[in-house]
Amino acid sequence: MSNISTPQPRIGFVSLGCPKNLVDSERILTELRTEGYQVVPRYDDAELVIVNTCGFIDSAVQESLEAIGEALNENGKVIVTGCLGAKENQIREVHPKVLEITGPHSYEQVLSHVHQYVPKPTHNPFTSLVPEQGVKLTPRHYAYLKISEGCNHRCTFCIIPSMRGDLDSRPIGSVLDEAKRLVNAGVKELLVISQDTSAYGADVKQRTGFWNGQPVKTSMVSLCEQLASLGVWVRLHYVYPYPHVDDVIPLMAEGKILPYLDIPLQHASPKILKLMKRPGAVERTLERIKRWREICPDLTLRSTFIVGFPGETEEDFQMLLDFLKEAKLDRVGCFKFSPVEGAAANELPDQVPEEVKEERFHRFMQLQQAISTQRLQDKIGREVLVLIDEIDEEGAIGRSMADAPEIDGAVYLNGETGVKVGDIVKVKVEHADEYDLWGSRV
């Protein structure tokens, strides 16, 4: 029994960036725990620190470089992975003392480097029990389900393909097995993520896989149909506006998956969309939105846009505002264009001055805030299902079907004590502001 008291080697871990990066962190942490390593929250307790970086925009690069610097100062032994890891020279210029650098989703390389500097412990199942669903960094009641890596698009403002490569879809049986494990472990909401969710299966020509002994096509629609059978909330993120997105709307109307679509549209001027290398048929987009809402009246639409893109005139920007007025999207994120090292858009002529970007950003947000506020006001008096995320001294806080974690609003149940985290309850909406709802259990 002497093995049981052998101290486990201790690893520190810093995870930055988007939910896709979070899933990569979960995978690495699961492998470390499975091999008997202990993951610790303090630099001075760790024998080595792994930093999983983001490199999408300049502020994210800066945050990643600062996190690496902090880990070096506080600990000294650092392995870097993630999107910024694809730019090794950029890291080495600032932090030459980093031990090893790998790009994103290089799980085996990361573990190999860990073994090199902190040898693998004697494996003992009593000290390294790992839940079947793996290590999760989200609360127990929801989880991110990553279905693919990379992207085949070449949007001029984006460098993701240069960091994460072309589309690489996971086998559908593997995705569904993971989803089943998560649900069995108590997950009530699956958030489907990737760089390009609607392209799922395109790289393998939608080949037929197998799950539960049945043939299943590798496609977003087939995946949604199968996930619906698990009896939990299924939420779609990062859905590029391909024509076949129309096919998931009936599934939402039937209650099989959540009536929620995160669909980045980026702009509404055909000229700017062409410069971005994005689909440019704005009238068709408005027609589709109208049709989707006819099929599924409860549909929540979230999108993101970029203002101040090179070449954007006041006329182009006005087209974007007109689009917002007509589309009446529920949730919207807006970014001021900023050059990302390696992005094709940096070389475009007619760069927009910073003060103009700032002014357009504020006009955009002012308009959209009024639209979002009205969309929420319209829910007053209605009954909605709410997934409880948190209990505090004032009551319970949760999310409706219209709210993704981290990025959308919340539903506050002040004074509510009869619920626990992970419960799904019916709530009558009594009050709203521009982001959140307040209500009472029915």
Curated annotation (Swiss-Prot):
Cofactor(s) listed: [4Fe-4S] cluster
Domain Radical SAM core per the UniProt entry, residue ranges: 137-375
Residues reported to bind [4Fe-4S] cluster 2: 151, 155, 158
GO biological process: tRNA modification
Binding note for cofactor: Binds 2 [4Fe-4S] clusters. One cluster is coordinated with 3 cysteines and an exchangeable S-adenosyl-L-methionine.
Pfam families on file: Radical_SAM, TRAM_2, UPF0004
Domain MTTase N-terminal: residue ranges: 9-119
Any GO MF annotation of the entry: 4 iron, 4 sulfur cluster binding
Entry's localization field: Cytoplasm
Main localisation: cytoplasm
Alphabetic keyword roster: 4Fe-4S, Cytoplasm, Iron, Iron-sulfur, Metal-binding, S-adenosyl-L-methionine, Transferase
Gene3D superfamilies assigned: Methylthiotransferase, N-terminal domain, Nucleic acid-binding proteins, tm_1862 like domain
Role description: Catalyzes the methylthiolation of an aspartic acid residue of ribosomal protein uS12.
Recorded family membership: Belongs to the methylthiotransferase family. RimO subfamily.
The protein, known as: Ribosomal protein uS12 methylthiotransferase RimO
Organism: Pectobacterium atrosepticum (strain SCRI 1043 / ATCC BAA-672)
